[in-house]
Amino acid sequence: MPILTDFKAIATGLFVTWKHIFRRPVTVEYPEVKRTPAPRYRARIVLTRDPDGGERCVACYLCSAACPVDCISMEAAEGEEGRRYARWFRINFSRCIFCGLCAEACPTLAIQMTPDYEICERDIMELVYEKEDLLIDGCGKDAGYNFYRHAGIGVAQPRGAGECEEEPVDVRGLMP
């Protein structure tokens, strides 16, 4: 009986091999043929600007606190008009796992993920990107958003006076 079970195991293995031998290969010749990522693919991190051209990052440290591998570091500074900004901002892409938690934690939408997945360097120190390397000229996905224009609107205005906010309904006036 053990000979029959061995023969059956060999026949099953050969059947699986012959079944796959005539299929097309799934290997992609990467440098020559580049795959297009999915529409919602997240890869390289960039820092975006406001519509008026200023930096969006206010150095609140929420991105570095949300990062599970601690690859984001920065130093906060304050401008002449009292506006906070990041004096230096650094991301170590050799440690980054591209989870996107930093982009979700950013209250100013300064950190955004792009589908650029080609981050290859021979020296590991070249994977440490400074603020100048990360800043892009555009606003990214949220072109009309300006943190300082939207921050504190609900505090200074009565209910119903904010952007895209309806007037409150007086519930007592609806009663008979």
Swiss-Prot record:
One of its GO terms (cellular component) is plasma membrane. Its EC number is 7.1.1.-. It holds the Pfam family Fer4_7. Keywords: 4Fe-4S, Cell inner membrane, Cell membrane, Iron, Iron-sulfur, Membrane, Metal-binding, NAD, Quinone, Repeat, Translocase, Ubiquinone. [4Fe-4S] cluster 2 binds at residues 67, 96, 99, 102. It is found in: Cell inner membrane. Its cofactor is [4Fe-4S] cluster. GO terms for biological process: aerobic respiration. Residues 45-77, 87-116 form the 4Fe-4S ferredoxin-type domain. NDH-1 shuttles electrons from NADH, via FMN and iron-sulfur (Fe-S) centers, to quinones in the respiratory chain. The immediate electron acceptor for the enzyme in this species is believed to be ubiquinone. Couples the redox reaction to proton translocation (for every two electrons transferred, four hydrogen ions are translocated across the cytoplasmic membrane), and thus conserves the redox energy in a proton gradient. Belongs to the complex I 23 kDa subunit family. This is NADH-quinone oxidoreductase subunit I 2. It comes from Geobacter sulfurreducens (strain ATCC 51573 / DSM 12127 / PCA). The lineage of its organism: Bacteria, Pseudomonadati, Thermodesulfobacteriota, Desulfuromonadia, Geobacterales.
